[in-house]
Amino acid sequence: MAAVAAEPGPFARHHLRRYAFAWQQLAGRDGRHLDLGCGDGDFLPALHAATSLECWGADPHPGYLAALRLRCPDLPVHQLQVFGELCFGEAAFDSVSLLDVLEHVPDEGRLLGEIHRVLGPGGLLVLTVPRRHFFSFLDPDNAKFRFPRLHRLVYTARFGQQVYAERFADISNDLRGDMSVGKDEHTNYRRPELIALLRDHGFEPETVAGANLFWRWFQVPALLAGGRLRALLERFIYLDGEIFTSANMFVAARRVP
C-alpha cells in the first residue's frame, strides 16, 4: 500500500526505541495491518488511533488481550495458539509488525512462514529483536532459566506471589511468562544470521537499524523500580539509544514470492 515518510510521532521520546522505528515505517501507510504479539497495547492503540491503517492485534496471552479489549473495544484482536497456525487467510494483510517477539518463539522459521502466508505480495514486515553483543548475558528474560530461584524471589517481592504464579507457574496457554513453553533461551541475534533467516523465508530486508549498548544495566532496575527512579532509569535507556546501536536490531523487510 502507499507510504509516505513518517516522524517518530508519539514514540519520539519513548525509552524503547523500537516503537519509534516501527511508527516511522508504518504510520504513513494504509491498508490492513497486523500487530503480531501485540501484548496489552504499548504500540497498537496509538497506531490504531492516529493513522489510516485498519489495525488488528493478535497475541497468545489471554490476560494481555483482555486488557487491550478494555482499552480499545473497537480494535479487533485474536488469541493465538502458541503451536498453531495464524488464524488469518492468505494475503490478508498489507503489513505486519513483530516487535521483540521472534526471540520468544520455539520455531522462528515456522512463524516467519506463517507471516509470509498472511502478507500480500510486496507486503511489509517490521521486525525488532535483541541483538547479540557484549552485554547479552544481562538479558533479564533468561534469568528465569539460569537463576530460577533468584528470579522467583525478586519477582514475587516486586509483584506478589499470585502474579508470579499466573505468569510463570501456570503454563496452560503454552506460555511461561512471555516465552513459549519448549523455548529455554531468549534468543539474541547476530545481524548476518537474522538477515539469512529472513531471506530463507521469503523476506528481503530494506532497512536495518539498531539502538542501545548499555541499556541492560538500566533495564532490570527500571523494571523493579517505580516513580521518579524508574523515570530516571528510563531516561538513561533513551539516551543510550540515542548514542549507540549495538544492543537491538530493527528491520523493515518486503515479502517476496
Placement of each model-derived feature along the sequence:
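C-terminal beta-strand of the catalytic ATP-binding
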Residues: A253-P257
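Short, cationic motifs built from Arg/Lys/His that form the positively charged side of catalytic pockets
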Residues: R117-G120
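A short SAM/SAH-binding and catalytic strip from SAM-dependent methyltransferases
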Residues: S97-P106
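Conserved N-terminal segment of class I S-adenosyl-L-methionine
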Residues: M1-G89, S95-S97, L112, M179, ...
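Alpha-helix N-cap/helix-start and coil->helix boundary motif
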Residues: G41, P62, L102, R132-F134
